[in-house]
UniProtKB/Swiss-Prot annotation:
HAMAP family for this protein: FluC (MF_00454)
Subcellular localization(s) per the UniProt record: Cell membrane
Name the UniProt record assigns to this protein: Fluoride-specific ion channel FluC 1
Transmembrane segments: 4-24, 31-51, 61-81, 96-116
Gene designation per UniProt: fluC1
Record-stated family: Belongs to the fluoride channel Fluc/FEX (TC 1.A.43) family.
Notes on how activity is controlled: Na(+) is not transported, but it plays an essential structural role and its presence is essential for fluoride channel function.
Record keyword 4Fe-4S present: no
UniProt: Na(+) binding residues: 71, 74
Gene Ontology terms: biological process: cellular detoxification of fluoride; fluoride transmembrane transport
GO cellular component labels: plasma membrane
Native source species: Bacillus subtilis (strain 168)
PANTHER family reported in the protein's UniProt record: FLUORIDE EXPORT PROTEIN 1-RELATED, FLUORIDE-SPECIFIC ION CHANNEL FLUC 2
Catalytic reactions on record: fluoride(in) = fluoride(out)
Main localisation: membrane
């Protein structure tokens, strides 16, 4: 049951990431950073922070939502690809900014989500 739940949660998270990332990217065309995935990763970190702060006792629910949904909603691999693409295009300043915004923004968002549930 838990494995099926992770599968379903992951599918939903991935579909939401795909849709939201594309919507944000379309609305921010012309900007020098990949804002779609940046936003998705920060929102995912915030959501996971809130969920983690709730201290859900049911291990299956934690796996389905934490590992399944939020694991698929956020994406370190796409962040990595986009960073390398910026570097290969010799857009070093943008790549550094993207790295800093993604890492610091995600950590801060997780912390905010976690602390508001305390």
């Amino acid at each position: 049951m838990t494995l099926a739940g992770i599968f379903i949660g992951g599918g939903l998270g991935a579909m939401l990431r795909f849709w939201l990332g594309n919507v944000i990217t379309a609305k921010t065309k012309g900007l020098s950073l990949p804002i779609g995935i940046l936003t998705v990763n920060i929102l995912g970190a915030l959501g996971l922070g809130i969920f983690t702060g709730l201290h859900v006792a049911n291990a299956s629910v934690s796996l389905i939502i934490g590992t399944g949904f939020f694991g698929a909603f956020t994406t370190f691999s796409t962040f990595s690809v986009e960073t390398i693409q910026l570097l290969m295009a010799k857009r070093v300043k943008e790549s550094i900014l993207y790295i800093v915004l993604t890492l610091c923004g995600s950590l801060f968002a997780f912390w905010c989500g976690w602390t508001i549930t305390i």
